[in-house]
Amino acid sequence: MEARDIILKPLITEKSVAKMSEGKYAFKVRLDANKTQIKQAIEEIFGVTVVRVNTMRVRGKLRRQGKYIGRRSDWKKAIVQLKEGDSIKVFEGL
C-alpha cells in the first residue's frame, strides 16, 4: 500500500485547528491502516518526524431519505503528534 492510499484527507474542524498549535494534526485514514503505516505515510508525504499516533474508529451516522433509512460508512481518524518545532505547511494559516 502506498502512502497516499493510507492518508485519505486532512480533517479541518474547529477542534483540530486548535490542536495544531500543540503540533497535533488530524487525518481521515483507511479503516485497515495501523499506527505504524500511518506514521510512515505522514513522514513520507510531509517530510516531518512523527512522535505519536492515536487512532479511533468513528461509526457512521444513520441518515434518512424519505421513508428509507440508511447509514454512512464507518471511518478511521488518526491524530498525529509531530516532533517539537515541526509543522505541516499545508495547514498553516488556518
From Swiss-Prot:
InterPro entries: Nucleotide-bd_a/b_plait_sf, Ribosomal_uL23-like, Ribosomal_uL23/eL15/eS24_sf. It holds the Pfam family Ribosomal_L23. The keyword Nucleotidyltransferase does not apply. Keywords: Ribonucleoprotein, Ribosomal protein, RNA-binding, rRNA-binding. One of the early assembly proteins it binds 23S rRNA. One of the proteins that surrounds the polypeptide exit tunnel on the outside of the ribosome. Forms the main docking site for trigger factor binding to the ribosome. Part of the 50S ribosomal subunit. Contacts protein L29, and trigger factor when it is bound to the ribosome. This is Large ribosomal subunit protein uL23. The lineage of its organism: Bacteria, Bacillati, Bacillota, Clostridia, Eubacteriales.
